[in-house]
Each structure stands twice: as structure tokens, then as C-alpha cells.
Amino acid sequence: METVYIVGAVRTAIGKYGGSLKTVPAHTLAAEVMKEAVKRAGIQPDIIDEVILGEVRQSTEASNIARSALLEAGFPETIPGFTVNRLCASSMQAVNSGCQEIWLGEADCIVAGGTE
């Protein structure tokens, strides 16, 4: 079994419901966080095998927020993205799914996290 490493963690500023970030779509915030995570990890986006993001509320702006965010971040369009909706445990499931892909030898580098 492959050893899995979490090489970085990034988050946005803490906002409040209906606050100053209310007009910023979740996929736009996620894109900024993903760009910063990749920068801090010292990797190039083209080595990413998949982006997995969890969310609680699916919006009509980005029905697959993982895919929308990775494209907005400027990552290669060859990278697949999938969205997990498991309510409060969505981001944990996204990280678990990424670990499983690495353990199974299906991926070497995953960007995983959550929104909201």
C-alpha cells in the first residue's frame, strides 16, 4: 500500500452567511485556494491526477464544483474533477476518496478539499 502524504492545507478567510463574500461564487473561492495550495506545495498543476471537492449545497452556477474550480484555477482541462455531496462530511469524504485512489495506485497526486 502506498504511503499517502498531505503536503499542505489552505483555507479562505472566515466569512459569515450573507457577509462580504456572499457575491463570490464558491467555485471562485475554491479556485483561489487550490492555486495557493499547489503553489505552497511547490508542484505544477500538470502532475495533478484529479481534483475532488466536497460541498453541502449544490448551486446551479457550478453543478460539478470540482471541475468548475479547477478550470477557473487555470489547471489543465485534462484533469478530471468530481464533487462529493455528503452534507457535513463532504470534505472529509473528498480527502478519503483521494487517499483511496493513491492507495490503490490509481493516482499519484490529488487535490482534495471542501467548500462552504
Region locations from a protein language model:
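Active-site-proximal alpha-helical scaffold in enzymes
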Residues: 86-116
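Active-site nucleophile and cofactor-binding loops and adjacent substrate-binding regions
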Residues: 62, 81-90
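Short, conserved beta-strand segments within well-ordered enzyme catalytic domains
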Residues: 50-52, 83, 110
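Conserved "HGTGT" condensation-loop signature of ketosynthase/thiolase-family condensing enzymes
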Residues: 1-79, 115-116
